[in-house]
Amino acid sequence: MSDEVTYATLMLQDSARVRGNQDGNNLRKEGHPAQSSLWRGAALSLMTLCLVLVTGLVTLATMFLQVSNDINSDSEKLSQLQKSIHPQQDNLSESLNSSRKSLTEESLQSQISALLERQEQMATKLCKEFLIHASDHKCNPCPKTWQWYGNSCYYFSINEEKSWSDSRKDCIDKNATLVKIDSTEERDLLQSQLSLTFSFFWLGLSWNSSGRNWLWEDGSFPPPTLFSDKELASFNGSRDCAYFERGNIYASRCSAEIPWICEKTASLVKTEDLD
């Protein structure tokens, strides 16, 4: 009896063990699909991430190539620009140096001219002082028997009288012209000499029949500021030459014989003649 009980017990235990093993196997078989799905999801995510990374790398590589090409193109343009700028810079430098040199030369020339002018003024002033005490001083810029006033030398024909044409010829022989009055100062100066020498004299002014006007020997017109319109209107075609008297000009026959005055530019006063 006890043997039967023991056998029955063993059979029940074996049966229970078999069922337990079957249940465990069934549980393992049921759990495998869940793990496989999880791995597939992870793999898909990794593949997607790799695809995104590859796409990003390709995009970055494309952008890098584009930027590299742009840099190379800009470098070539910069190089060409530098090549074109260098000659311009050289030309600009040469022009600047030339301008500086020109300005320096002009400045020096201006200073030299100013110094020479100042020297001439001082020499002229000293010479006039010397001539007050010695009329024949060697610094005199005018020939002997000539009078020096301003920038001109004057020759007064004190003891001679000639026609206008002969007077003009005499002045030409002296490398001068019949006097031309350019300013009120010169007019007043000549007027002051009349009381000392003579009362009237020929002018280098004559009637131009073709132009129907009065002209100085250099072809210029007598200024209306020196002689009134009334005085100019007093001229007529029968009297073709002009003379000066008491501060005015008058017309006369050119054949009339009266004194005359020659005029020419005074020479520069030499500093070595001031000794």
Swiss-Prot record:
The keyword Isomerase does not apply. PROSITE patterns: C_TYPE_LECTIN_2. One of its GO terms (biological process) is negative regulation of receptor signaling pathway via STAT. A motif (ITIM motif) lies at residues 5-10. Residues 1-41 are cytoplasmic. One of its GO terms (cellular component) is plasma membrane. Inhibitory receptor postulated to negatively regulate immune and non-immune functions. Upon phosphorylation, recruits SH2 domain-containing PTPN6 and PTPN11 phosphatases to its ITIM motif and antagonizes activation signals. Although it inhibits KLRK1/NKG2D-mediated signaling, it does not bind known ligands of KLRK1/NKG2D and therefore is not its inhibitory counterpart. May limit activation of myeloid cell subsets in response to infection or tissue inflammation. May protect target cells against natural killer cell-mediated lysis. This is C-type lectin domain family 12 member B. It comes from Mus musculus (Mouse).
